[in-house]
Structure formats: C-alpha cells, structure tokens
C-alpha cells in the first residue's frame, strides 16, 4: 500500500532527506526517470548550438530585467486593453487572498488547476480549501501526488519519486480503478476522471511561461492538454505568475521556448503551446468569460 510522505518542514528536513536517500525504491525511481530525461535532453540539442542559444536567451532575459518596471506597466496596459484584468500582489499570501476573493465573487465551489509551480510555493490549494473551495490538480503528475496527499518532488515531473506499481496502487486505493501496470490504461483512467471536472469547474487556475508586454499575451507551454482545458472550459480563468516571466516582444518567445522545451523535457516542441490574449469575445463560442492575471 502506498503511504503519503510527511510534510517537509525546515526543522525536519535533515532527517527526512536522510530517510529518502536511504530508501532504495525512491533512489531507483529517480535514477530511472532522470537517466531517461538526460538522454533525451542531450539528443534534443543536436540540431542547435546550445551555447549560442543560451546566450541569446540570457540576453533576452537581461534586456527585460533592465526595463522591468516599464515592461510591467506595458504588460498591464495591454492586458487591460485586451480585457484581461490585472492584479498585483506583494507576496504569496496576498496573491492567495486575491485569488480566493475572485473565486468567492463568482460563488465558486470548485477550481481546476493547470500546472503552476508558483501556486505550489504560495500553498494556494490550502488557502482555497480553507475557504471551502475544492482545488483539483489536472497535470497528471500533480494529480497523482495530490491523490496520495503528497507535494511535487520535481519541478518538471512532480511524481518522479513514484514507479508504475506505486502509481497503480494509488489510483486503485484513491479512485477505485483496477490495478494495472499498463501506463496507457492508467492514463486513460485518469483522463476519464478529470474530464468531467474540467466541464464542471467554476474557475480554472494556470501558470504562465511567458507574459508578453508588447501584446498583452500570456503563453502557456504543456503536453497533456490540461492547460488548454483549464484555461478555456471554466467560465473564469486566473493566470498566476511572478514578474520574472515578462518578456518585451513576441519575437522574444521562440528562442526562449526552444531552450525551455529542450532543457525541460528533451522535446523540440511541446504538444500544446497556448497564447491567451483576451477572454471570450462576442462572436466566439468558447473560452472563459473572464481572464485574470
């Protein structure tokens, strides 16, 4: 039977770290996943001069940093002109309060979440739950660790510490699915469980990979399609990001995207690349009625 990990605290970190390092199953799970990921990453840069691309990406980021106050104002102005409502928070606690307030204004009882590391850092789920709002992760790895009452163990692969058998046990124990080691079958079962939740959620919460000041566009990189559903199916979409994600021009995105996909998952392109510039317009049949940043 799968067991939830303890909540990590600064006081207990050393003991918990030693416990994890001494667990041969966790070490084997990490090694298998990381060996595969690093191999894919090396191959993904075969058609690129990595150092040149890295230098280009660094220059784009440094240029944005040198103009950051102006770019943030430009981003806000263009987002607002597009119909995206912009909110500023000084810290995670303020951001959680703002997001909770937006949900409450819409009478929301359920939130579906795309992958967002900043929301993890803010402990957004706990804040929403304290307000009586259910928050469900839709990224497959995040969904699995949430089912097992854990937190993500890796920024790209949240469930990297779990192997196929452990995942099968979690899904069987928490959702009643049949035990299987067939990855496709487990993925299909999770997809079926999540699909209805996308359609019935009151609010969708996502992260942001790039926020383009020039156009007021929010870019979201993903592979599972959950990001697109999170940002289009619920009537309200809330995008959560730190100020470091802003870039000046739309033309700055492709080189950063090339670096991101190859470095993160060893892919030339991800399955989905979403560009969000407004809520649903009068002549459109789908998309959220409100978008908040």
Model-derived regions, located:
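The feature marks the mature, well-folded catalytic cores of soluble enzymes
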Residues: 1-293
């Amino acid at each position: 039977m799968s067991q939830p990990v303890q909540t990590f605290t600064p006081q207990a970190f050393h003991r918990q770290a030693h416990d994890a390092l001494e667990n041969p199953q966790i070490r084997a799970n990490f090694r298998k996943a990381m060996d595969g990921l690093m191999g894919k990453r090396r191959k993904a840069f075969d058609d690129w001069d990595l150092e040149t691309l890295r230098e280009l990406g660094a220059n784009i980021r440094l240029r944005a940093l040198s103009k950051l106050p102006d770019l943030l104002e430009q981003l806000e102005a263009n987002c607002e002109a597009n119909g995206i409502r912009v909110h500023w928070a000084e810290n995670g606690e303020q951001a959680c309060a703002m997001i909770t307030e937006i949900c409450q204004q819409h009478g929301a009882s359920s939130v579906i979440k795309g992958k967002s590391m900043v929301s993890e850092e803010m402990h957004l789920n706990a804040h929403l739950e304290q307000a009586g709002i259910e928050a469900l992760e839709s990224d497959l790895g995040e969904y699995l660790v949430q089912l097992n009452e854990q937190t993500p163990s890796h920024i790209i692969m949240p469930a990297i510490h779990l192997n196929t058998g452990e995942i099968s046990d979690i899904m069987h124990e928490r959702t009643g699915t049949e035990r299987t080691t067939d990855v496709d079958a487990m993925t299909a079962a999770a997809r079926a469980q999540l699909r209805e939740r996308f359609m019935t959620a009151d609010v969708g919460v996502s992260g942001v990979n790039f926020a383009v000041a020039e156009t007021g566009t929010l870019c979201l990189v993903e592979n599972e399609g959950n990001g697109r559903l999170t940002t289009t199916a619920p009537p309200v979409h809330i995008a959560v990001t730190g100020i470091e994600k802003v870039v000046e021009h739309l033309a700055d995105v492709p080189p950063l995207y090339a670096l991101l996909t190859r470095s993160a998952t060893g892919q030339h392109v991800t399955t989905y690349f979403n560009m969000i510039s407004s809520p649903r317009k009068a002549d459109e049949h789908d998309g959220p009625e409100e978008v908040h940043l």
